Amino acid sequence: ALILPHGARYNAFMIDKTPPALADIEAAARVLAPYAVRTPLISCPALDERVGARVFVKPEILQRTGSFKFRGAFNKLSSIPQAARAGGVVAFSSGNHAQGVAAAAQILGMQAAIVMPADAPVSKRERTKGYGAEVVLYDRAREDREAIARDIAGKRGATLVPPYDD
C-alpha cells in the first residue's frame, strides 16, 4: 500500500472497477427506501451556465448521519447473511463511514466496532459512539488501521466493512 498524507493508505482495492448493474442499483434502492432520507435534487442555474449543461446537486448533508456514506453502509450491512450478523461488524474510518456503519448496525440490531484515529475530531468519535458503536482508537503515525480492524474481526468472527471496494 502507498502511504499518503496523514497516514492514509492507497491500496489496489480502491481502483475503480466495473460499475454496478442497473439491477443492483435498483435492488439497493429497495433495501434503502424504508431507512434512507430521500434527499432532494436541487438545480443550480449559475453552475448550469458555467458548464453549459443542466447540473443538479444532491445535498447528502440531509441524509442520516449527514453523509452519503450511510447509503453504502446500510446496503452492505443488509447484505450480510443473518447467520453472520451475530458476529457484528468492524470498520475503519475517520468519520463519515464510521457513522454510516454505526447507524446502519444500530438499525439492524448488530454490534459494531469502529477503528478510528485518536486524532479524529471528538465530535465524530462521539457521534459514532452515539449510534451504539464501540470506538477503538489508534495512532495513525504508528499503527495500521486495516490490520487492527482485521485482527478485531478475526477474534470476534465479525464482518469487515472497509470504506471502499463495495
Residue ranges and their predicted role:
Residues 10-166:
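PLP-dependent amino-acid enzyme catalytic core
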Residues 1-13:
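N-terminal amphipathic/basic-hydrophobic helices that include classical n-h-c signal peptides
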